[in-house]
Amino acid sequence: MKGLGSTIVRSLPNGARLVCADNTGAKELEVIAVKNYSGTVRRLPSAGVGQIVFVSVKKGTPEMRKQVLPAIIIRQKKEYKRADGTRVKFEDNAAVIVTPEGTPKGSDIKGPVSKEAAERWPGVSRLAKIIH
């Protein structure tokens, strides 16, 4: 895992629903925790593009549902600013289910992947068809 050059707006708090953008069998995910989050008292933990979160599978195949798994956020609706000054935003909030080491469990990623997530996680960039 590498560091990021841009400032990512952390716009996905606990309870946020995400689209699962891989072929693991999960369709909809809910953020339940953010890994390595240290915040203020009474503030909801939140995450942004390229961060690893723990999710609960809400919709999907019966084998995948009700499981708690780590995932990497690859897209977010809230715009964020890159180091070169451009602003980026996507159509939806999406994540990819991964192993605890950070390698994707699926063999395919649907839709674009943010450049920040691809740079930080080489396993995700290997499966991405579009890096935006």
From Swiss-Prot:
Keywords: Ribonucleoprotein, Ribosomal protein, RNA-binding, rRNA-binding
GO cellular component, one term: cytosolic large ribosomal subunit
Single GO MF descriptor: structural constituent of ribosome
NADP is among the record's keywords: no
Annotated Pfam families: Ribosomal_L14
PROSITE patterns: RIBOSOMAL_L14
A biological-process GO annotation: translation
Domain of life: Archaea
CDD domains registered for this protein in UniProt: Ribosomal_uL14
Family according to the record: Belongs to the universal ribosomal protein uL14 family.
PANTHER family the record matches: 50S/60S RIBOSOMAL PROTEIN L14/L23, LARGE RIBOSOMAL SUBUNIT PROTEIN UL14
Oligomer status and interactors: Part of the 50S ribosomal subunit. Forms a cluster with proteins L3 and L24e, part of which may contact the 16S rRNA in 2 intersubunit bridges.
Function: Binds to 23S rRNA. Forms part of two intersubunit bridges in the 70S ribosome.
Name of protein: Large ribosomal subunit protein uL14
Taxonomic path: Archaea, Methanobacteriati, Methanobacteriota, Methanomada group, Methanococci
